[in-house]
């Protein structure tokens, strides 16, 4: 783990302490064996290399949304991609994390939202019940469908 974190710290332009703490927390949230945490690190590095987002900002945002994203049904790799998308829009990781958490929490309780929310869904060609079922079946697919509408 120490060697992996040292490599991540260098690649992510973060201190080893910050990288280690963030990755340990993510490993705990997503129940990733420490021996496999390098796969998440590799994915974050790849996302950073292919987007305007810095790896350290992706890690920071991902650390803020890990629990909510997991509860929503996203894997760690899917959550990392979502964090990357928001950070790539030029938002600071704190803002990206807050926005992602808010969106996922609203969608997680879609069936409990008020009439205005349900009317907006209807205008998008969706229903609260249908979206709730879609999230339960395929969280990432439902989220992509919602965002693409």
What are these regions (language model features)?
Residues 1-149:
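Amphipathic alpha-helical interface segments used for oligomerization, scaffolding
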